């Protein structure tokens, strides 16, 4: 059943949780200040549309649903967005692989969009409109369609999102939803049919796989002692390579990324914890911190308050200071 909606967020965790079809396994905001983002989504018959507008630089680790074929792109006037280590400029699009995992990094206020189409429908429409049944590629591709084709796709996408934001009920009418959907699908297939592939090169794909192994190691070992030498060994690369990949994809060093992931994990546990049954020390140790004084100082630097203050605060209240990083 067609549906749509728009929401505004001042808390990074709430924003992260709202992207149900685009699971953000991790969202680290990389600037001080009051976080603000808005999300507009439209669910038509076979299409899922999402437009996000964000005020602050951040890095996200994203896992796409295998049920849909996704195409992503920056907004018309958005600064470059780094998708999987590659700068994406207005007019370019990403055709994602099935269930793709990747990092997305922004350097400032930006907007970006995502179109999801059920795999079977993607194959059927592509065969009808291009003469060739297309499927999600084995690896994500950055494409460079003709300017008029990408402009048409963005215009129709923006039109649908504007209706979802200002007149959401109208998208509940089957004829309106069907007309918008057909126009967007046709524009999308035109972009995919007549396009140039932006050369990423196998080296970029290899480096992306290094980052995925890095994330797998962190998912398994984040709560334990993890020295740089061990992290490199488990990832299967030397320290120089890991540092280079993290700088390219994440914009920060591996050690800084690990610290911020642990602090975010601790922040979530403290925010949701019951102070009658859990202590700051227990949470800190569970998140891999062995020196409580150093943990408390790092936590306060990032979140603007002590860990105990977060634990004592009633759920849903208090400041929403985002995580920030320095270039270390």
Task: Annotate each language-model stretch with its function.
Residues 1-34, 80-222, 227-229, 233-239, ...:
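Alpha-helical bundle regulatory/interaction domains
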Residues 242, 246, 294-295, 299:
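Short hydrophobic/aromatic patch on the recognition helix
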Residues 210-214, 258-263:
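Generic hydrophobic, amphipathic alpha-helix propensity
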Residues 237, 247, 256-259:
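C-terminal structural cap/anchor segments
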Residues 64, 207, 259:
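Short, conserved glycine- and acidic-residue-centered signature motifs
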Residues 61-91:
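Glycine-rich active-site/cofactor-binding loop and its immediate structural neighborhood
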Residues 42, 81, 295:
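Short aromatic-centered micro-motifs
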Residues 1-67, 72-73:
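N-terminal low-complexity or simple alpha-helical regulatory segments
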């Amino acid at each position: 059943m067609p549906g749509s909606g728009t929401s505004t967020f001042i808390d990074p965790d709430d924003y992260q949780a709202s992207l149900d079809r685009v699971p953000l396994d991790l969202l680290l905001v990389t600037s001080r200040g009051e976080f603000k983002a808005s999300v507009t989504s439209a669910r038509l018959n076979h299409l899922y549309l999402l437009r996000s507008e964000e005020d602050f630089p951040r890095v996200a680790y994203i896992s796409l649903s295998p049920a849909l074929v996704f195409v992503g792109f920056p907004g018309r006037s958005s600064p470059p967005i780094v998708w999987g280590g590659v700068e994406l400029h207005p007019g370019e699009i990403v055709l994602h692989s099935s269930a793709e995992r990747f990092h997305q990094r922004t350097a400032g206020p930006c907007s970006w969009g995502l179109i999801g189409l059920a795999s079977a429908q993607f194959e059927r429409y592509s065969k009808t409109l291009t003469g060739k049944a297309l499927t999600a590629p084995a690896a994500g591709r950055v494409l460079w369609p003709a300017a008029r084709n990408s402009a048409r796709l963005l215009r129709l996408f923006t039109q649908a999102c504007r209706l979802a934001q200002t007149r959401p009920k109208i998208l509940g009418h089957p004829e309106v939803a069907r007309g918008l959907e057909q126009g967007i699908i046709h524009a999308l297939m035109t972009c995919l049919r007549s396009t140039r592939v932006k050369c990423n090169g196998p080296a970029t794909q290899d480096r992306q796989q290094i980052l995925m192994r890095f994330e797998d190691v962190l998912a398994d070992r984040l709560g334990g002692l993890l020295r740089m030498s061990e992290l490199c060994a488990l990832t299967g690369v030397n320290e120089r390579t890991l540092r280079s990949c993290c700088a390219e994809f994440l914009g920060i060093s591996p050690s800084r990324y690990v610290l911020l992931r642990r602090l975010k994990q601790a922040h979530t546990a403290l925010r949701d914890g019951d102070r009658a049954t859990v202590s700051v020390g227990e949470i800190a140790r569970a998140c891999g911190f062995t020196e409580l004084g150093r943990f408390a100082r790092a936590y306060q630097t990032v979140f603007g308050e002590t860990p105990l203050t977060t634990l004592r605060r009633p759920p849903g209240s208090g400041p929403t200071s985002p995580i920030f990083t320095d270039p270390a």
